[in-house]
Amino acid sequence: SSIVLPQNWLFLTSYKKFREKLLKNDTWHLIVRLGPGAFETISGEVVKAILISMSRGNSAKESSGLFGEADDGNLIRGVDVSEPRTAAEKAAQLLTAEIKSVLQAKQLENPDARVAFDKVSGELLSKYADGVNGMHGADSFHFRFNYWEITDFLIWHFFQCTHEETTHFGGKQNVFYWAEDGRCHRDNPRAYVKGEGVWGKPGVVVSMMKILPVTLYSGNKFDISCTPVISRNPAHLPAIWCFCSSSEYNEAVRRIDQKLNVTNATLVKVPFDLDHWTKVAKEKYPNGLPKPYTDDPTQWIFHGHPCGSVIWDEEKKGTAHGPLRTDDTVLQVAVARLLGYRWPSELDAGMELADEQREWVNRCEALLPYADEDGIVCIPPVRGEVSASDRLLNLLAAAYGDAWSSDILAALLKSADHAGKTLETWLREKFFTQHCK
């Protein structure tokens, strides 16, 4: 018999026993991965369908021809047309796509008996690392905020979250309420407090959606939508990072799990060649993995300097000072400083940061006198105070130092979509809209 149905049961851990039963007791003939958009009358992009053909009983002699056996073991034939976007394109590719063959009995040897067209061989990442489940407080709107909305970091703890692209450091914009050691969450049956065993340990954070972007993990509490992969041997972490940050990692995971959001257990059930990736790590990171750095002001590790820059230097194989920034965040950071805001990295001398990142944090001390004492800055001059635009101009000049010029100001206004105009009109017309992005 043949049937079209969602593909998830071929690889989800919860269907392991069901797969084992069918693989042992029935004969599988053909699996066609149709993917999203396989039917002209169904527009959904989330449901990924398969066409599967099988028969009762597990006799390797029952089929012949295309669905024949090899070495007395039944072969499952597989065709993958999941990549084309339209039903017409999929139909055309069905006629030309490669037909793969895998032994049915060998599927039982795959992790969790997952059904895959490609052979899963070699040692798994799970031999060297664990994929750890995250937590949520059952009420994100009540217990989870952006860090810049909070001032008391004794009861609000930094909370590692998902990120959109692979980068050394990302997903560091949230805090999570954790008064009395998280008592309100531990007492709440709807909340999930997970991952305590890896808090404080370094690792690799995988966002569990789409192309599985990764970032380095610094040991913070973490969201249920991302999974830290924690090396059992810290010496293996650079190799694991190099593997997980490569395209090969996403491809390996997707060979065994095509679900939109994968599970934490799946993330370490892929082949991992420790020797190979150790060599890659020695070449890419001879001085070790970087300490936290970023020029993104939405991250709690941001140095707080309006124009300071820290980059990864491929030649040096380490962090380094970059060129002074003139991007669209510079004016926003400068206004925040003018109003008296300071980043968490400035307030925590013990926060782990790259040396260059800490240098920029220290340089922010020279900008403190430019901050308003009461946090209220009027655009026009009021009661003897200088206008907001002039005060902002003075702060920027101090931040850039000898590099400051009218050309820098012009570049900043251009980056803020306000080319050829003034700081005052930017404050009046553009600042708030851009601040709320």
Predicted segments with their positions:
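General secondary-structure edge motif
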Residues: 2, 32, 186, 209, ...
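Terminal accessory regions of large proteins
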Residues: 195, 283, 287-437
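Extended accessory and catalytic-adjacent subdomains in large enzymes
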Residues: 270-272
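Alpha-helix initiation/capping motif
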Residues: 103-104, 201, 263, 354, ...
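Polyanion-binding catalytic cores of nucleic-acid enzymes and NTP/SAM-utilizing transferases
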Residues: 100-232, 268, 280-296, 300-327, ...
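Glycine-rich, acidic and aromatic/proline-enriched surface loops and short helix-turn segments
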Residues: 243-250
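Signature of N6-adenine DNA methyltransferases within the class I
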Residues: 1-155, 168, 218-227, 234-238, ...
